[in-house]
Every structure is written in C-alpha cells, then in structure tokens.
Regions:
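Short glycine-rich, low-complexity/disordered patches
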Residues: 161-164, 212
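An accessory alpha-helical subdomain
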Residues: 160-162, 188-189
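Nucleotide and nucleotide-moiety/phosphate-recognizing core
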Residues: 8-145, 151-158, 166-185, 202-207
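Short, basic/aromatic-enriched C-terminal tail that caps enzymatic domains
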Residues: 187-212
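Intrinsic disorder/low-complexity segments
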Residues: 2-4
Length: 212
C-alpha cells in the first residue's frame, strides 16, 4: 500500500524504540529480533512504517545490537524509560514531525497512522486515547518542539510522558476515530510476554487465512 505524500508536510521520520529490557520474555531474549511469521519483529515494524516514511528511520537502542541498520542511536540518559528513548530519537531526527513506535508492535495499521499524520496541523503531539483514558505514547507523533519540555523534565528526573502534556499543544485521537481505521485496536498490541508472542502468531495466521 502506497500512501500519497502530503505536499504541505515535510518528510516524516519514524523512530523505533528498541532499547528496553526484555526480561519478561526470558533471560537473554532480544524481543526486537524475535521471529514472527519468518521475519523478526523489528523488520515487521519497519515494513509497516516504510509506506509513510520511506527510509527515514531511526532505531533507538544499543548500536552494537543492530549493526545491520542504517541509523541507530543510543539513549542519551542512563535511566531507561520510554521518554528517554523518545527524546533520544527526536534529538537525532532532522524531521519536524516524527512517528514514534515500539519495536514489538507488529500490527501497526498504516491507515490509522496516516490519519494521525493528517491531524498534525499546528499540534506538537498527536496521541491515541482509548478505553478509560488510556494513552499510547509509543504509537504517536511528536514534533521537535517537544524536545525542550522533555529535556527540562529529564534533567529533573521526571520520566513520565504525561508530564509533558501541559506545556504542549496535544491532539488526542479518540477511540471512535481510531476504530474507523483499526476496529480491533491491533495497532497497540505489543509483545511483553511469551503468551503475547503466541497470540501474535494466532493473529498472523488468522490474517493469512482471511486473505486467501
């Protein structure tokens, strides 16, 4: 699927966070490289993002773990947290706006991401909100203007993504909007446990069957 380029929007970059520990998957497991349907998770995620960003991709994680990828940057703060990863990726990006996702989200819906891009306008952050107000910071679009607020919080050891919201112009994508493009909310499915991997395999098998 090729998404038409928005002539008014400068090129976006996708930032994939791959620096988190995978302890819940078992000792020594790098979940970014887990095999799902014959491909490793991070490559599946990249394939979902490329129709939107082409080769404008940044992986945030230990560079020595991902030598085969073009641009890999480490976390810029020693404290491991999603906010640190997001900040590190934004700092390395030349794009005004950036799609940020986790490396373990194999069912990202391109149409939903495209809708989010269309809602950037003059916002600093576009983020899904569903259920009882649950936010998905690792399937969101961040503008470079977020950097100043993030850095101010990080140097104060404030690692909550929500803590940056009061200082930014935020567009929440509500559940009703999300379900127009992703009725099952599969874009937000991520893999933390072995059971999640089993479920992901079943989802992938089901999709293969339905496409026959």
């Amino acid at each position: 699927m090729i998404v038409e380029e928005n002539k008014e929007m400068p090129p976006l970059t996708a930032i994939i966070l791959a620096g988190g520990r995978s302890n819940r998957m078992g000792a020594g497991k790098d979940k970014a490289k887990l095999n799902l349907g014959g491909k490793c998770l991070i490559d599946i995620v990249i394939s979902r993002l490329q129709p939107l960003v082409g080769d404008n991709l940044i992986i945030v994680g230990p560079p020595e773990k991902y030598p085969a990828y073009k641009q890999v940057v480490p976390d810029l703060f020693s404290k491991g947290s999603p906010l640190v990863g997001i900040y590190s990726g934004l700092k390395a990006s030349f794009s005004l706006y950036n799609i940020v996702v986790g490396c373990d989200m194999p069912f990202l819906e391109v149409k939903l991401l495209q809708y989010m891009i269309e809602n950037i306008n003059s916002n600093d952050l576009v983020i899904p909100r569903y259920g009882a107000g649950y936010l998905e910071p690792l399937c969101a679009i961040y503008g470079k203007r977020c950097l100043e607020v993030m850095e101010r919080n990080l140097v104060k050891d404030i690692f909550s993504v929500r803590a940056i919201f009061p200082y930014l112009k935020v567009r929440f994508i509500e559940e009703e909007e999300i379900k127009k493009y992703d009725p099952g909310l599969y874009s937000f499915f991520n893999i933390n446990y072995k059971q999640d991997m089993i479920r992901a395999e079943k989802i992938m098998d089901s999709r293969r069957e339905s496409s026959k």
